[in-house]
């Protein structure tokens, strides 16, 4: 196979020579047979880096990498040197194998592309004219087989796409059928309810009435509980010294005030028997990083009534209670006053 070494006519330095390719002057490295692509592009008023970015160049490099089983680094290499030196300046740049020269030259010059195009057309026309019948028929068969193979591949791709489209259409129909069945079922259920004399609006209205009745009952229970708490409070004051403490310490009532790192309700109360109070305290310490006991009272006979009295009095000072949670952020008292108030309320049971 011909090499670019055969078009070299003058040595520049070492293995680097001047050459001629059609109307293009070349710099050829006879050691590798590669040409200086950088200099060829410059002579055509172009830049090699721009050609190297094209999709065409990437496909060519990929093709020759696969065909020749070599890496890109072996396909092209760069010669560096001092461009201030006139001789060295002539040979610096990126070198490519001869397989790339036609594409780069055509990219640089439309005239060169036209010339090469005419040469190629003339070559294949002459080849056809000089071909004997047997060779020509073999060539025709080969070309037709390739075309048929391409057509078959395209038909297979098209069939796969059509199959996927059919699957999507079928899936869409099934989804629509399911939605239709759901709508029919809803209509059927609503009709059944109406036949039974039940209307959704009536059910909603009845639910609202029931909720209102429950709310009224809750209010009545709250009033009743308040009266019971007052009676129990009086009984507690009267029998405190008489009622014996449980023999087991774990069953004695405790009232505990905690402080936690909670932005909304930093204070928390525990009212329970000692054994349950310990479990509740442990749970709080598992939930929060910072938990401290501000107040721990042993209540007798009941810690629940103490909490009722605490809430009744401190709510008047702006303290907010949410079940066991307490907030004094918008109240008239501080933490020290909160603790003192709870202790005072607890001590009031002795003022008989």
From Swiss-Prot:
Pfam families, sorted = DUF3627 (PF12299), KilA-N (PF04383)
Source organism lineage? Viruses, Varidnaviria, Bamfordvirae, Nucleocytoviricota, Megaviricetes
Q: Which residues form the KilA-N domain?
A: 15-123
| Keyword match Lipid biosynthesis | no
Query: Coiled-coil intervals in this record?
Result: 129-236
What family does this chain come from, according to its entry? Belongs to the IIV-6 006L/238R/313L/468L family.
Q: What is this protein called?
A: Putative KilA-N domain-containing protein 006L
On the tree of life, the source organism's domain of life is Viruses
Please report the organism this UniProt entry assigns to the protein.
Answer: Invertebrate iridescent virus 6 (IIV-6)
Keywords attached to this entry:
Coiled coil
């Amino acid at each position: 196979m011909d090499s670019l070494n055969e078009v070299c006519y003058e040595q520049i330095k070492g293995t680097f020579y001047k050459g001629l390719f059609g109307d293009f002057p070349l710099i050829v490295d006879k050691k590798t047979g590669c040409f200086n692509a950088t200099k060829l592009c410059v002579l055509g008023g172009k830049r090699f880096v721009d050609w190297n970015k094209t999709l065409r160049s990437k496909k060519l490099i990929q093709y020759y990498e696969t065909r020749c089983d070599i890496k890109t680094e072996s396909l092209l290499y760069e010669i560096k040197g001092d461009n201030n030196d006139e001789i060295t300046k002539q040979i610096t740049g990126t070198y490519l194998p001869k397989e790339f020269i036609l594409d780069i030259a055509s990219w640089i010059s439309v005239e060169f592309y036209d010339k090469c195009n005419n040469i190629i057309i003339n070559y294949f026309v002459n080849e056809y004219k000089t071909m004997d019948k047997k060779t020509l028929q073999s060539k025709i068969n080969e070309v037709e087989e390739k075309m048929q193979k391409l057509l078959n591949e395209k038909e297979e791709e098209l069939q796969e796409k059509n199959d996927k489209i059919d699957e999507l259409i079928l899936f869409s129909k099934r989804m629509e059928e399911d939605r239709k069945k759901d709508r029919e079922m809803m209509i059927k259920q609503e009709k059944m309810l109406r036949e039974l004399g039940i209307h959704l609006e009536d059910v909603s209205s009845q639910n609202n009435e029931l909720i209102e009745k429950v709310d009224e009952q809750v209010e009545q229970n709250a009033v009743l509980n308040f009266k019971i708490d007052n009676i129990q409070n009086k009984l507690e004051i009267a029998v405190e010294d008489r009622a014996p403490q449980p023999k087991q310490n774990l069953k004695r009532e405790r009232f505990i005030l905690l402080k936690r790192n909670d932005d909304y309700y930093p204070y928390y109360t525990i009212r329970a028997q000692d054994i349950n109070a310990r479990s509740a305290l442990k749970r709080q310490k598992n939930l929060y990083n910072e938990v401290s006991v501000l107040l721990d009272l042993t209540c007798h006979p009941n810690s629940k009534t103490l909490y009722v009295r605490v809430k009744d009095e401190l709510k008047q000072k702006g303290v907010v209670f949410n079940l066991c949670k307490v907030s004094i952020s918008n109240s008239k008292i501080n933490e020290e006053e909160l603790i003192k108030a709870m202790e005072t309320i607890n001590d009031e049971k002795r003022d008989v």
